[in-house]
Regions:
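Histidine- and/or cysteine-centered catalytic micro-motif in compact active-site loops
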Residues: 73-75, 104, 144
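Conserved N-terminal entry element of GNAT/NAT acetyltransferase domains
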Residues: 134-138
């Protein structure tokens, strides 16, 4: 006899480290394979099972971040562990090869400027039309100049940095050497 959907879901959730996002669509895919269900049936079964887990308090450490996104928490001396927002940003806007970080944040990270930028800008295929702010994740997303792929992602990021070098307050005496070193480290053949 197979496990109940709720037990299956709890088993899958328990192996996820605290703070890491848990997506119901991924749980549904696992249920579909394990129980040989259609995608639609698996989604419905997952929704019901997760709701039961939350309502009955089967896993008191499970928290809902937003519809379809959950995470496990743990108590620390500083309060509860929250969701890993960096992972959420990567899953939503950057992976798999659909976006990259741009703006002054990248220049700061590679050491071209000492100014810590106020905003974090991502170029992503998810952005349609114009620049907008995701207030929940505290990032600005903008559409790329061309569709981002695995092959052109690094090139586009370097081109954005070259464009920014002309406008940004640069502290480095030889910014183009720093950019060249950065591209070599990234194994880009630029």
């Amino acid at each position: 006899m197979k496990k109940k959907y709720t037990d299956f879901i709890c088993e899958k959730i328990r192996v996820v480290p605290e703070g890491i996002p848990i997506y119901t669509r991924q749980l549904a895919e696992k249920i579909a394979v394990a129980y040989q269900l259609s995608k639609r049936e698996a989604s419905a079964a997952t929704a019901v099972a997760v709701k039961r887990v939350m309502d009955k308090g089967v896993m008191p450490e499970l928290r809902c971040y937003q519809k379809g996104v959950y995470y496990r928490t743990a108590a620390t001396p500083f309060g509860e562990i929250g969701i890993n927002k960096e992972q959420l940003i990567a899953d939503k806007y950057l992976l798999p090869d659909i976006g990259y970080e741009t703006g002054l944040t990248v220049l700061y990270k590679i050491g071209l400027t000492s100014q810590m930028p106020r905003e974090r800008i991502l170029a992503t295929n998810v952005a349609k039309g114009c620049m907008r702010t995701d207030r929940k994740l505290d990032v600005i997303i903008r559409p790329p100049k061309t569709i981002i792929t695995a092959k052109n992602k690094d090139y586009l990021q370097v081109l954005d940095m070259l464009e920014l070098v002309e406008k940004a307050p640069i502290d480095e005496k030889h910014p183009f050497e720093v950019l060249a070193d950065y591209t070599k480290r990234r194994n880009s053949n630029i």
